[in-house]
């Protein structure tokens, strides 16, 4: 006996409706963070060739404002990003301990290559090395949360 395709599809959809992924446990989260820091993200020992200066920080803030604010907000802490609570995996605050524990070289590697499948795109070929390193300086000295307002793209 052949079941109509709509019956099979309906049974499959009902079965899938009950499926839900649980958030990772603490040990799963810590394992992923450890693996990212020690195995998946390159350039751990690379040093930022740009010294910290207000001009380099301003350059980093400018580059960040063109390429990063849609997901990370003007302050790097997701302020004013309307979809922030609906993204999986979640977009981290760049002030978080997890992000700040990367070396400068690892942060540049992430900016260059992105983190798949998180949605973080790579910028290799789009931004110069100096722009990337200046963004790293900006990330190390983020302004206070909420102090930069909401990205313009979300206020119109």
Task: Annotate the PLM regions.
Residues 85-141:
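Extracytoplasmic electron-transfer domains, predominantly the class I c-type cytochrome c fold
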Residues 20-22:
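Bacterial signal peptide processing site
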Residues 27-63, 150, 156:
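Electrostatic cytochrome c docking/interface patches
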Residues 24, 42-46, 65, 118-156:
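Flexible coil segments in periplasmic/lumen-exposed cytochrome c-class electron-transfer proteins
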Residues 39-40, 55, 61, 65-88, ...:
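Periplasmic/extracellular electron-transfer cofactor-ligation site
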Residues 16-18:
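C-terminal motif of bacterial Sec signal peptides marking the signal peptidase cleavage site
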